[in-house]
């Protein structure tokens, strides 16, 4: 597990978290098995990606006036959750004075091609917890982190089967995005594991899409 040296952030990165064949098998399963939906934002336009939210009972939360209610875990996501928990460095919690608590929800994003994206944002909702782990499957897409001044702190196409963990004050000090890349024709799935802290108590945050 590599540590990305960015002042004010705490980031762990494993480029080869899943073997290629296993990552491809999981990608194909989730592509057809997840209950994908293309939601509309509070401003009535379609969010430019498909989403599926799975989690323990009570892990609902609200983002941009849209409530996410968890679907029941499917076996493949439960199995992956256990592996991601095992790979998450305990120091990610101890640096914050916390005991390891694992993940109780996952937001799955499907980018069907390079026209799908997620705008610059921070996962800074108080109920989301400070440690967020992301598994990438499928087409490599640019993942970019920017500081408060807009300066790029990290920019890399995350590989198929990679694990990227943001912890510490990363969400407070930085925003991240997956910009549009019209030349990308193939789909990408991103699985973002979280620990919902205040279960069942939604917030009302506006986000970029």
Task: Indicate residue ranges for each PLM-predicted region.
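Non-heme Fe(II) oxygenase metal-center motifs and adjacent flexible, charged/small-residue loops
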Residues: 1-209
């Amino acid at each position: 597990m590599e540590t990305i040296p960015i002042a004010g952030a705490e980031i762990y990165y494993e480029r080869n978290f899943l073997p290629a064949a296993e990552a491809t098998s999981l990608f194909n399963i989730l592509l057809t098995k997840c209950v994908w939906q293309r939601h509309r934002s509070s401003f009535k336009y379609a969010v430019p990606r498909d989403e599926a939210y799975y989690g323990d009972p009570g892990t609902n939360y609200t983002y941009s006036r849209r409530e996410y209610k968890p679907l029941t875990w499917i076996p493949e996501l439960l199995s992956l959750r256990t592996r991601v928990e095992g790979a998450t460095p305990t120091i990610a919690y101890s640096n914050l004075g916390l005991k390891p608590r694992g993940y109780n929800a996952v937001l799955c994003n499907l980018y069907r091609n390079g026209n799908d994206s997620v705008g610059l944002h921070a996962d800074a909702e108080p109920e989301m917890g400070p440690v967020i782990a992301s598994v990438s499957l499928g087409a490599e897409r640019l993942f970019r982190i920017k500081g408060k001044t807009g300066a790029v702190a990290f920019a890399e196409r995350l590989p198929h089967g990679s694990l990227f963990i943001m912890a510490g004050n990363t969400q407070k000090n930085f925003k991240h995005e997956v910009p549009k890349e019209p030349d990308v024709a193939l789909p990408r799935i991103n699985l973002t594991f979280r620990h919902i802290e205040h279960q069942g108590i939604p917030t009302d945050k506006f986000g970029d899409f």
